[in-house]
Amino acid sequence: MTLLGTALRPAATRVMLLGSGELGKEVAIECQRLGVEVIAVDRYADAPAMHVAHRSHVINMLDGDALRRVVELEKPHYIVPEIEAIATDMLIQLEEEGLNVVPCARATKLTMNREGIRRLAAEELQLPTSTYRFADSESLFREAVADIGYPCIVKPVMSSSGKGQTFIRSAEQLAQAWKYAQQGGRAGAGRVIVEGVVKFDFEITLLTVSAVDGVHFCAPVGHRQEDGDYRESWQPQQMSPLALERAQEIARKVVLALGGYGLFGVELFVCGDEVIFSEVSPRPHDTGMVTLISQDLSEFALHVRAFLGLPVGGIRQYGPAASAVILPQLTSQNVTFDNVQNAVGADLQIRLFGKPEIDGSRRLGVALATAESVVDAIERAKHAAGQVKVQG
C-alpha cells in the first residue's frame, strides 16, 4: 500500500529535486498534482523548477558536504536527480543510511559518466555498442584514435548537450579536439571516450518505465540532433517490428541491471532490423518532452508514478506528435516572448521554461504539436517555435 501525505503538513511526502531545469519543473508539477511537497535544488537561483516548488536551495551539487547539509535540513523521502553533475558518492552514502535515491544511487553513479554505463552495457550485459576506448591523457587519446580509426567521435566521459564533443575526420583535428574535450566536461578536465562511428538509419529514445507492475515502454521517440543537442523530436518513430522488439529487449536489460523504480531514457541507434545501444539516462529525457502532448501520461507523470511506488497500468499514445525547441541567441536577464498568439492553437501548444537569463544560445521553451502524420506534426511544431520572438 502506498501512503501519500499532504504538502506542508507534518505527514507530508517530500521530494527533493537535484537539478531544477525544465525537466525538473515538469516533475515538480506532477508531484504537486499528487499533493507531494517539493524542494528544488540547483546551482543557480530562480531555476525553472524553483518556480513551482514549495522551497528551494542554491548549492554546488558536486560538493558532497553541501549536498548532505541540505538533505539533513529538508529530510526528503525521495531524492530525484535531474542532471549528471552531482556528488554521486554522497548519494550512495545517503542511500546506505536509508534515503530513497531515484531510481537508485547505483544507477545515478553508473550513468553519471559514459565509462560506467558503457562498461555495464558492453562488458557485463554484452549488448551491441560502438567500438570504444577510454583515455585520460593526450598521448593515450591519440593512441585510442589510432586504434579506433577515422572518422571517430571524442566526448568527455561526463558532459551533456554536446559539450566537449568533436567529430574527428583527420589527425589535424586531434590537438583541438583534446583541448575542447577538456573544457567541456561537467566536472572539469579529465577522462574521455573515443567512439567509432556507427552506421545507422536513425536514432531513437525508448522511454522505459520500471515500476511495481513491471517494465513498460512508450512508443519510440525519434529526434534530430544539432551540435550535440536535440532540435526536434517526434513520436512514434516508425521502425520494423523486429527492430522494436530488439530495442525493447535491450532497454529492459539495461533498466533492470541499473535497478530501482522510475523512467529511463534509453538511447539507441537503429539500422534496418539491427539495434545498437548508445546511452541511458535514469530520468526523463529532453527528447521525451513530446510526451507532454502525445500520451495520456507524460514521461514526467510516469517517472513520478513509478518512483512513488504506484502502478503504471498502461500508456496510451494518441498518434503522430512532435516537439521543436525554442532556441534563441542573445544576452539578457529580462527575457520576453512576443507573438505567442501565433504559436498556439488547436492541437498546438508551447511551454516556456522561465529560465532567468540567457547569454548566448539557450533552450528557453518548446513547441508541441499533433497532426495526421509525423512529418506534418514536425512542421507544425517547428513553425510554432519559429513564431515566438524572444527579446531581451
From Swiss-Prot:
PROSITE patterns: ATP_GRASP. Transmembrane segments: none annotated. ATP binds at residues 114, 155, 160-165, 195-198, 203. Disruption phenotype: Mutant defective in both purN and purT requires an exogenous purine source for growth. Pfam families: ATP-grasp, PurT_C, RS_preATP-grasp-like. N(1)-(5-phospho-beta-D-ribosyl)glycinamide binds at residues 22-23, 82, 286, 355, 362-363. InterPro entries: ATP-grasp, ATP-grasp_carboxylate-amine, ATP_grasp_subdomain_1, PreATP-grasp_dom_sf, PurT, PurT/PurK_preATP-grasp, PurT_C, Rudment_hybrid_motif. Homodimer. PANTHER family: FORMATE-DEPENDENT PHOSPHORIBOSYLGLYCINAMIDE FORMYLTRANSFERASE. HAMAP family: PurT (MF_01643). Belongs to the PurK/PurT family. This is Formate-dependent phosphoribosylglycinamide formyltransferase. It comes from Escherichia coli (strain K12).
